[in-house]
Amino acid sequence: AYWSKETHEAGWTNQELQAYSTGQVKVGKDDGKTVLILTATRKGDKIVSGRVNSKGKKYFKYGKIEASIKLPRTANGLWPAFWMMGNNRQEWPACGEIDIMEMGDAQGIADGTSARRVNTALHYGPDVAGHEQQYYAGDCGLDLQDGAYHTYTLKWNENNIEVSVDNMKLHSFDITDNAYFHSDFFILFNLAVGGAFTGIY
């Protein structure tokens, strides 16, 4: 298996409300295919959810990386993400981060476009104080939370990182002279709840 389940306490990062538990990640069947299922559940006054990564098992440098994902409705504070982190053994953001798809941001919740508004970004820099980012967020015109699978694609070469959904280009980042994005990265999937991104605490 290429995936490791993560465990973290609530509030571990980004002021998120959930704790991550291995029990919230399952392998199942849907539409005849084997799928990873990440679930967020309220247990009393606590929320637990799922997060997996391919660190130590599968790395990528350049190429085409895509995932077919069925998303929940995010207007209530759910924050699903398909992303990557660098494996240079540096702390964030010096490791580099590629956010292929994030949904559920505060702006989308506020203006009623949460089901169509996709965020994609690059994060990098020598340390937290020197954090830089390239960022795109926009209404793609598709309901990506309609109960169907949608395909999110990263195309990555020496010059560009391009992100698309269902073969529709969302954004292209120029990385020609950005040393943070020319090394091995691993993949993560998670379902966060609340926090700074959603504006729900």
Map each language-model feature to its residues.
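GH16 jelly-roll
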Residues: 1-201
